[in-house]
Each structure stands twice: as structure tokens, then as C-alpha cells.
Design a protein with these regions (language model features):
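Tryptophan-paired
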Residues: 1-10, 14-19, 26-145
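A short beta-strand micro-motif common to beta-rich folds, especially ectodomain repeats
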Residues: 263-274
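Solvent-exposed, low-complexity, repeat-rich "mucin-like" stalks and linkers
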Residues: 168-243
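Short strand-edge motifs at loop-to-beta-strand transitions and within beta-strands
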Residues: 14-16, 149, 253-255
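Surface-exposed, short loops/turns at beta-strand junctions within beta-sandwich domains
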Residues: 102-106, 260-265
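Hydrophobic or amphipathic alpha-helical targeting/insertion segments
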Residues: 277-278
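Low-complexity "stalk/linker" and mucin-like segments enriched in Ser/Thr/Pro/Ala/Gly
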Residues: 62-86, 215-252
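Low-complexity, acidic Ser/Thr/Pro-rich "mucin-like" tracts of secreted and single-pass surface proteins
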Residues: 132-176
Length: 279
């Protein structure tokens, strides 16, 4: 804690009252799991993009990505963190549902709840929920010192139209480079997967350019898909057993797919614009 009082005279005896304020913010998570036929099993709860540095007085400078770290907590339903301030900034958002990756500042602090969701009479799917911190305003993403943030989160489904919901195991989670080809195991309990689909070619954000046509694709050449679809797949049993049962596009920039019942196979999926043109 810290404080100050400028009303001080060094030539006389002084009795000073100094108001102290906390140098950190308190973040509390209260997690409620489904209480019906659906089942959600938590695998990890993380606090992402936490500032590493703590200053005696309030900082006005934005935090850089190099000054951030991540916290991993236990999987209990009630967790409290004490963290330094993070001036991630504000946006023009007006709807709480739009607070997700791509709309939020890259350095904004958020809670990531990971686990396996099994809907009633459905198959298990890996899923993560991202909840960004900020003031009582959809546009604000700042974490301010001497402030308490209470997040009451209730898990209620895996809606692909909600950008805060990340359905499927993330195949592009290793770093900024994604691939144009992925291999997954059909024997895993999880049948749902996702990968980033906002950059052409192999998705590299670096100077490496790869194009299946042989033409040059500028590094980081971004696209803005509206939907995704199946282009081609192998099928078993005279075409009745599919490699993929579902292909879709989520609002947060991922193509999401669900494995079919085929024990092995190949498939091609594509990101598309609003006119169904392949991007």
C-alpha cells in the first residue's frame, strides 16, 4: 500500500494523516457449473496477460506484451488473485458479448476457463471460455489498482456464435504460426477441434510465405471469413460414414470441425466470405 500527504512542515512538529491505497487489484472468480443433464469438467483455470511489474504510484503508460505473464490456478470454483494494474486501454465496444479476441486489446487481462463439455446425449468436446477484465463498461479493458473485480461465471453451453466461447481443441495453440494441414487422432474422447483461419497460406505471421499455388502470399495477409464449409472428404461404407460431421466458423476467427465416425480419413475445409467464395 502507498499514500502521500503534502501538508508537511519540516520546521515544526507534525501529526500527519496519510490515506493508503492498495497497489494491486483483487480479482475474484465464482464459477457455476451446469446443474442439468449437461456436464462440464474443468481442466485448467488461468489468468492471462498479467502485468509483471508493480509501481509505487499509478502508471499511465500502457503495458507491453513483454511485460506480461500468465497465472495458472487450481481448478476450484472460487479463486482469488492479487495482480498489478494493467492499462490495456479502451475500445468502441458497446455490447458485452463482443469482448473477445480480435476485438479486445492484445495486452488485455482475461480469465481463461478450460475443460471438457458433454451436452445431454452428445459427445465430449474440449472448450474454453475467455472472460476479459475491465471497468463496468464493455469498452473498458483496464485493470486498475485498488479495485476489486468480481467475475460470476456460469457455464451454460458451447455456442459458436459467442466469440467468448472457444469450442474444440486448439490445433494452432503452439504459437503465431498455423499450418495448412493438421493430423488428429480419431480415438480421443474429444471429437471437436479448431484452428485459426484469419491469415492466408499457412497462417504464418512472419516473413515466411507459403502458397499451394506457387504464387507469392504476403506475410500476414489477413482475411475476414464469415463462414466455413466442407470442400471434400473421404467416406467409408459406400459413403455413409463421414470423416467430418460438422464444419463451421466461430466469431473469434476459428474454423471448428467435429470428427465423424470413420476410423480414419482425409478432409478439406475452407474459409468463405458472405457469398460463399473460398478465401
Amino acid at each position: 500500500m502507498c499514500g502521500s500527504n503534502d501538508n508537511f512542515d519540516s520546521n515544526t512538529a507534525n501529526t500527519l494523516a496519510v490515506s493508503l491505497t492498495r497497489s494491486v487489484a483483487k480479482v475474484s472468480l465464482n464459477l457455476t457449473l451446469p446443474n442439468g443433464a449437461d456436464l462440464f469438467t474443468v481442466s485448467a483455470i488461468k489468468l492471462m496477460n498479467v502485468a509483471k511489474k508493480l509501481y509505487y504510484v499509478e502508471s499511465t503508460a500502457p503495458t507491453t506484451s513483454a511485460e506480461l505473464t500468465d497465472y495458472t490456478s487450481d481448478n476450484s470454483n472460487t479463486i482469488t488473485w492479487y495482480i498489478p494494474e494493467n492499462k490495456a486501454g479502451t475500445t468502441s465496444l458497446t455490447d458485452w458479448k463482443d469482448r473477445y479476441e480480435g476485438n479486445a486489446p492484445a495486452t488485455a487481462t482475461y480469465i481463461l476457463i478450460e475443460g471438457s463439455y458433454t451436452p445431454q446425449n452428445g459427445t465430449a468436446r474440449d472448450v474454453a471460455y475467455a472472460i476479459y477484465l475491465g471497468d463496468n463498461d464493455p469498452a473498458d479493458f483496464n485493470v486498475t489498482r485498488n479495485t476489486k473485480y468480481t467475475v460470476n461465471a456460469s457455464i451454460r453451453g458451447t455456442n459458436l456464435d459467442d466469440g467468448r466461447v472457444l469450442v474444440g481443441k486448439d490445433l494452432s495453440a503452439a504459437g503465431t504460426r498455423t499450418a495448412n494441414c493438421y493430423v488428429v487422432k480419431t480415438t480421443d474422447a474429444n471429437k471437436w477441434y479448431r484452428f485459426k483461419a484469419t491469415v492466408r497460406g499457412n497462417g504464418a505471421q512472419t516473413a515466411e510465405d507459403i502458397s499451394y499455388t506457387g504464387a507469392v502470399i504476403p506475410a500476414g495477409d489477413k482475411i475476414s471469413p464469415v463462414k466455413a464449409g466442407l470442400v471434400w472428404e473421404t467416406r467409408d461404407n459406400n459413403g455413409t460414414i463421414h470423416t467430418l460431421d460438422y464444419v463451421g466458423y466461430s466469431r473469434n476467427g476459428y474454423i471448428v470441425f467435429k470428427l465423424g465416425s470413420a476410423p480414419e480419413g482425409n478432409a478439406v475445409v475452407a474459409a468463405k466470405d458472405g457469398a460463399s467464395k473460398i478465401l
